[in-house]
């Protein structure tokens, strides 16, 4: 950056001196040089300051934001680079309460997300895409152990016990399309908060329409046409290969059931239908 400014300054100085050659009465070479220098500095003092300011502004890091969202800044973030998207539900009464929580603090400390999707479909952006929001907490997905550093966090205004509004899901799909396109995130890389932390999180709830999302091209869904898993297929190894942490197998099975079977009441193990689903997912 300093080299560019030096080059431009020398060019401006040279041009100014050339334009002033031959004017005025004869003087010694040294005095002419001093007068020319003074003239140049007077002529270019303010334009040069402006030029330097503009160049510095152009080279500065720019926060990445979505054109679909209302910017409502949260101070709770750091810098990072996203490769995956984590979906949450807010488990709060309304979007204003969620905005307060995501911009200040809650009983467990400061939290934030990049986006919040209201029940009416309005999208709020709280943290720039290139910044590290504090939404995932401890957990793991596949080989990723710091999900905050690797992900975009999207909170969805929902109390956890009600279906998600159609306008809200439509807005979410538009947002996913925008974010995946701009940040070059693979469209299959959309997971639940409960997927990465099954022992402590259950969001989004069983009411979340994962199949609808997959039909729109985001996330993954098993093919209905796929038959049973082959003999010898190990569903637990498959669950781990898919990305789920197995520190607590019962919790991992529960998170899987919630996402792919829409159930919270199944036994905390993996049955033949789970094996079929996992085999289908891993073969895609």
Where are these regions (language model features)?
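Basic/polar, cationic surfaces and motifs that engage anionic cell-wall
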Residues: 59-62, 165-284
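Residue-identity detector for glycine
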Residues: 3, 22-24
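Bacterial N-terminal signal peptides
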Residues: 47-57
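Active-site-adjacent loop/helix surface patches within enzyme catalytic domains
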Residues: 62-78, 83-84, 91-188
């Amino acid at each position: 950056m300093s080299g560019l400014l030096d080059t431009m300054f020398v060019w401006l100085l040279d041009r100014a001196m050339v334009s002033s050659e031959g004017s005025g009465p004869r003087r010694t070479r040294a005095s002419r040089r001093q007068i020319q220098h003074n003239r140049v500095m007077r002529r270019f003092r303010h334009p040069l300051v402006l030029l330097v300011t503009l160049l510095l502004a152009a080279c500065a890091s720019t926060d990445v934001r979505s054109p679909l969202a209302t910017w409502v800044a949260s101070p709770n973030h750091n810098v990072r680079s996203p490769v995956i998207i984590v979906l949450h539900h807010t488990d709060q009464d309304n979007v204003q309460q969620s905005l307060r929580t995501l911009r200040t603090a809650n009983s467990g400390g400061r939290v934030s997300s990049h986006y919040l999707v209201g029940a009416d479909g309005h999208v709020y952006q709280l943290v720039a895409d290139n910044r590290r929001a504090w939404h995932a907490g401890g957990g793991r997905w596949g080989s990723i152990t710091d999900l905050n550093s690797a992900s975009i966090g999207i909170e969805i205004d929902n109390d956890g016990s009600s279906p998600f509004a159609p306008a809200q899901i439509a807005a979410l799909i538009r947002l996913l399309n925008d974010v995946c396109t701009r940040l070059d995130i693979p469209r299959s890389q959309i997971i639940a908060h409960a997927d990465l932390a099954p022992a402590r999180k259950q969001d989004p709830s069983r009411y979340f329409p994962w199949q609808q999302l997959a039909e729109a091209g985001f996330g993954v869904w098993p093919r209905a046409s796929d038959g049973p898993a082959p003999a010898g297929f190990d569903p637990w190894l498959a669950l781990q290969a898919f990305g789920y942490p197995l520190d607590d197998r019962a919790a991992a099975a529960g998170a899987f059931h919630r996402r792919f079977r829409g159930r919270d009441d199944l036994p905390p193990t993996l049955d033949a239908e789970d094996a079929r689903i996992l085999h289908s997912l891993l073969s895609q």
